[in-house]
């Protein structure tokens, strides 16, 4: 039996949304689920205890960054990533591929792997399917990702076609190199840019390899959202119904709802934590930029409909002061709020699927979120 399995509970009668449970060696979580990103073995400014309090069930670690610092050997010596960072829930690690393709301009792709420069000190590095598997086996995550090529968007058809074929060959090498299939599940990543036939080919080729789960990669990289939704809708039909489906890099409220409707189960994104650091907050009325002068004496919470620690205890005026003064506590408060907001949104999505009313929920949510006149429909 694979290390990770998917249990289907029901499909929403209004949409293609799925309610399910993903079972892992470190516990189970209901889907659709958002996964906070802990790039360097920490979700920035948050303790594992705080993550549990806001109902985070699974978090993401970054293979590329952890390989470079502190090094996978140190994490292995500590007993794996769970012990190293004191998180006993499920962890997903990416393959390092996205960082190699996005952070480094000086890269050379060969059949063997990718040669590139360290994003800070310029030293030469090499990452291959085998190396990515070795690092992720050392990290000991519950879900590992296959090492894939991430073509830019847009890219020429012929280039993307060659790229997905290489991604499939690399996926086979990942399966061969994976040392711990009994306690770590390896997911394949479907690529194909904005070309429907290539997405289909990539999905079918990878499904033949029988991974325990599948991701859609190469979206949410700056393309218009309708293009992303179209690609998800098209690709979903070629993904197994009995395995988890992970849409990589998606974390805006509208996209989480739209892509849950289109049958996706798992999502991750740095968006809620990244925007929190400059004082941008997600609220039920839309985005709120706390640095704005009008909040200087506003004693209301960030969101009057929110029961997170931040909203129960602190005012907009206080949080604005902290962010303006560059106090770390301000970033902690906005991060707690944004992550709580998205995890609560996922809970609401799951409840709407249970009640067969996800399209109704979408309409209600969008209408309220768009009430922010200053920032209409900006998710």
Curated annotation (Swiss-Prot):
Known EC number: 2.4.2.29
Chain residues that bind substrate: 94-98, 148, 191, 218
Classification via SUPFAM superfamilies: tRNA-guanine transglycosylase
Gene Ontology annotations of biological process type: queuosine biosynthetic process; tRNA wobble guanine modification; tRNA-guanine transglycosylation
Superkingdom as given in the UniProt entry: Bacteria
This protein's UniProt keywords: Glycosyltransferase, Metal-binding, Queuosine biosynthesis, Transferase, tRNA processing, Zinc
Region (RNA binding) location: 249-255, 273-277
One GO cellular component term noted in the UniProt record for this chain: cytosol
Pathway(s) annotated for this protein in UniProt: tRNA modification; tRNA-queuosine biosynthesis
UniProt: Zn(2+) binding residues: 306, 308, 311, 337
Cofactor binding description: Binds 1 zinc ion per subunit.
Active-site residue numbers: 94, 268
Job description of the protein: Catalyzes the base-exchange of a guanine (G) residue with the queuine precursor 7-aminomethyl-7-deazaguanine (PreQ1) at position 34 (anticodon wobble position) in tRNAs with GU(N) anticodons (tRNA-Asp, -Asn, -His and -Tyr). Catalysis occurs through a double-displacement mechanism. The nucleophile active site attacks the C1' of nucleotide 34 to detach the guanine base from the RNA, forming a covalent enzyme-RNA intermediate. The proton acceptor active site deprotonates the incoming PreQ1, allowing a nucleophilic attack on the C1' of the ribose to form the product.
Protein family (similarity comment): Belongs to the queuine tRNA-ribosyltransferase family.
Listed name of the protein: Queuine tRNA-ribosyltransferase
Lineage of producing organism: Bacteria, Bacillati, Bacillota, Bacilli, Bacillales
